[in-house]
Amino acid sequence: MQSPPPDPLGDCLRNWEDLQQDFQGIQETHRLYRLKLEELTKLQANCTNSITRQKKRLQELALVLKKCRPSLPSESMEAAQELENQMKERQGLFFDMEAYLPKKNGLYLSLVLGNVNVTLLSKQAKFAYKDEYEKFKLYLTIILIVISFTCRFLLNSRVTDAAFNFLLVWYYCTLTIRESILINNGSRIKGWWVFHHYVSTFLSGVMLTWPDGLMYQKFRNQFLSFSMYQSFVQFLQYYYQSGCLYRLRALGERHTMDLTVEGFQSWMWRGLTFLLPFLFFGHFWQLFNALTLFNLARDPECKEWQVLMCGFPFLLLFLGNFFTTLRVVHQKFHSQQHGNKKD
């Protein structure tokens, strides 16, 4: 005797009942999630207000300590110094706390993104975003090496040059946005290494608008060769800095949100000093580019405003990069000599 054929509608109804039960569980989970989210928002506001109040009181205390310090007896100086050190340590703790709290965007992020909260709430999310930023820099650096080599040795076309300069504009614009988000999330990027990306964005934009002509052709090969060298040095820096940062983070000597930079910082002194000749050569090449452009601007046949407008950013990049790197090297030598004298 054959069994009755299955009832398709009955199966559908039974599946629907299962879905209904699951949906009720989802609704309850979502309700709890929204309650926790409201609690989290209140905690964030309370924590932010408490930190703001305590930072204000710390500033007032620091002013009082500064005023009374000259009149303190010698036996009280050690206690005053200890108090000052504790206050500085407290400021560092506040910096770490604020990395997990919503904050107002700076002017640049407000102009680009509006008043969107870009603070990531977990260590995993922060580290994943930082790691993705580092990979983005690495991949784009390799692409820029290939394209600059192609434009320099294989193709001599203003169209491909324009595409290369457009890529540079997009790359530096993207870096400035991502770095601003990382700063909001606790990355400690030094001021110049952020600002020089804005200068590079402006420079690449002017290069993009420079029309083909005698002045452009005189500077073209020099610029493409410089771009190739600069991308190569950036690749070297990423490769060696990432390994050095990994070791220092494992030893607890660097912050988890520290980034690779296109320059030299004090933490690179151990193991990365071999990069200094490459960096200084690149800095002086920027100066050479600026001087070349200023000489071209004096040519009677020069009619393009882009010549001078490219020369000034190259000069600014040289001054900023050279003196920032030189200051780090000088401070490191000074601290080493001071340490040797103590020994």
From Swiss-Prot:
GO terms for cellular component: endoplasmic reticulum; nuclear inner membrane; plasma membrane. Induction: Up-regulated during adipocyte differentiation. GO terms for molecular function: coenzyme A binding; monoatomic ion channel activity. CoA binds at residues 130, 187-188, 237, 240-241, 283, 332. Changing residue 193 to A: Reduces its inhibitory effect on PIEZO2. Reduces its inhibitory effect of PIEZO2. Pfam families: TMEM120A-B. Keywords: Cell membrane, Endoplasmic reticulum, Ion channel, Ion transport, Membrane, Nucleus, Transmembrane, Transmembrane helix, Transport. Its main location: membrane. Changing residue 196 to A: Reduces its inhibitory effect on PIEZO2. Shifts its ability to interact with larger CoA species (S-ethyl- CoA and acetyl-CoA). It is found in: Cell membrane; Nucleus envelope; Nucleus inner membrane; Endoplasmic reticulum. The chain crosses the membrane at residues 136-156, 163-183, 191-211, 223-240, 274-294, 306-326. GO terms for biological process: antiviral innate immune response; detection of mechanical stimulus involved in sensory perception of pain; fat cell differentiation; monoatomic ion transmembrane transport; protein heterooligomerization; protein homooligomerization. It is a multi-pass membrane protein. Widely expressed, with higher expression in the heart, kidneys, colon and sensory neurons of the dorsal root ganglia. Expressed in nociceptors. Highly expressed in white adipose tissue (at protein level). Highly expressed in brown adipose tissue and expressed at low levels in liver. Disulfide bonds: none annotated. TACAN means movement in Farsi. Multifunctional protein involved in mechanosensation, and plays an essential role in lipid metabolism and adipocyte differentiation. May function as a potential ion channel involved in sensing mechanical stimuli. Mediates the mechanosensitivity of the PKD2-TMEM120A channel complex through direct physical interaction. TMEM120A seems to affect mechanosensation by inhibiting PIEZO2 channels, possibly by altering cellular lipid content. This is Transmembrane protein 120A. It comes from Mus musculus (Mouse). The gene is Tmem120a.
